[in-house]
Amino acid sequence: MLVDTGHYNDDGEYVLQYLQAHDITRIDHLVTSHNDADHIGGNAAIIEYFETEADGIGAIYDPGIAASTQTYEEYLDAVETHDVTLYETREGDTIDFGTTDIAVLGPPDPYLENRARNENSIVLKITHGETSFLLSGDAEDDQEAYLVDTYGTQLESTVLKAGHHGSSSSSSEPFVDTVAPQTVVISSAYDSQYGHPTETVLQRFADRS
């Protein structure tokens, strides 16, 4: 499984280098948390590579909210060109991954926030044995509140991938307290032009360590 493919400036280069270095020849599940260009930047290149030079992609999972960017159009063109199965994925769906349980907790139906892409990210809880991971895409306060209200303690996870690159609009106190992670991973540029991750969010996690 591959979740998101990075910024459009990189065009999937670093993701592909990593996959090739680890002898990955097939992606059974390609998950697009949401269709912002900093999350789908490598989708087209990765689809092209795996469908023409490797062993293909089993299926793509997408929340179904379009973006008006060239990056998004190139992604859809690659899906169509190579006839890859594309699922519009919503809360309650499951992804078959053998003995590992993958539950889709978002986006809900109907969508939140007038179809805002961040607030309707695909949110996955992945559980293998005693270890669990919560991947929250770019979920912000409203989607986090929905998740807390809907799932409560079911959100508890060993590892949290913090929402929206550690932005102040995500990782709200009620959400962090409910997930109660032992480890937090923040994906962000080293010197983000947006100031991600924010000191407030970093301190929030530090206070709970």
What role is predicted for each listed range?
Residues 1-209:
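Non-globular, low-confidence helical/coil segments that flank catalytic cores
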